């Protein structure tokens, strides 16, 4: 399993300014996938970018070179490798499989058990498949991750905290308003999945909704009956009367700056505080908005904290969390067993084919000139002897594959089946830290 590597940049431990630069919007995924697949040795690649993380999963045809992968990612995002090395988490084999399964099940999210991530994983593999960057191995890995999420949520029920980043944002807004959200004016900016989730949570909380989008028709499509629909040009005026605004777009641009909130804002609002929540990466709201009197700004970093009124930190029931982790472990083993069978199948087939060819040659040679009644006895003796000699290498090859000993698998396949040199199904690989690079500034090893 050393052919699978993951470079992870988790939002909980990486500065927002760096995460913004690493964030890959849906429209940018094809270019990112192409750039990363162009790294020598990369056969398949998956790029997962959400408001909480950016991760790259690579399946290699030859010896893995995570340092090259990191340099390619940095270059594609217009960064040097040095800032990324400080925050990169490198995972290989079982750890990489386990990580994707935990992420997809919502167990690595700051809202434990959230299910929005499943759709994001599916979108990531769909984008990679469109670029021809998904083969059987990565597809099976994603299938395992989605199945794990399904099992976790079905098996744990209400024991695993149900919610999302959107519902957490709405709860935070309700906690900051004197009388909650019921009957208050909430402005939602965006028309994508995040905005849809915010609208649903706010509607349940009883808010009066206004949906604002670059495309008013798309805004109207997600707005519930009775909600106002506006274009982005109407945003400044809408802020004058809103009690709160939640940004949930995929735009890489700053849509709200301190200068957009003129000096008359506080006077017009008669001293009412405007709550602004930015769920976007890159951020839609410039951090300088924090300095505007009468405005309270929350971004994802704030929502991860426990000090925000209304923010209820995810606290799954211990039994549910334990069950979820058990399910992840089971599905990791299931995927690895599939991989072992696949990795060992071709070398074993070649070995057995060579054994059969050897038996046929030796039988033909040994029985030449023998009487017909002796031929079967000699042939059977030769067959048993050769198969007995081949049993040990075959068993060792299967055991090595099961233990993830790729070097041993490749060695045995080469020794006992010479044609294995032409097949790269299970190449030898010695893991190297990301920092092993000729770039002196990029010589550090990523955190584990």
UniProtKB/Swiss-Prot annotation:
One of its GO terms (molecular function) is glutamyl-tRNA reductase activity. Belongs to the glutamyl-tRNA reductase family. Pathway: Porphyrin-containing compound metabolism; protoporphyrin-IX biosynthesis; 5-aminolevulinate from L-glutamyl-tRNA(Glu): step 1/2. The record marks 99 as: Important for activity. It is an enzyme of class 1 (oxidoreductase). The gene is hemA2. It holds the Pfam family Shikimate_DH. During catalysis, the active site Cys acts as a nucleophile attacking the alpha-carbonyl group of tRNA-bound glutamate with the formation of a thioester intermediate between enzyme and glutamate, and the concomitant release of tRNA(Glu). The thioester intermediate is finally reduced by direct hydride transfer from NADPH, to form the product GSA. It comes from Nocardioides sp. (strain ATCC BAA-499 / JS614). NADP(+) binds at residues 190-195. This is Glutamyl-tRNA reductase 2. Gene3D superfamilies: Glutamyl-tRNA reductase, N-terminal domain (3.30.460.30), NAD(P)-binding Rossmann-like Domain (3.40.50.720). Its EC number is 1.2.1.70. GO terms for biological process: protoporphyrinogen IX biosynthetic process from glutamate. Catalyzes the NADPH-dependent reduction of glutamyl-tRNA(Glu) to glutamate 1-semialdehyde (GSA).
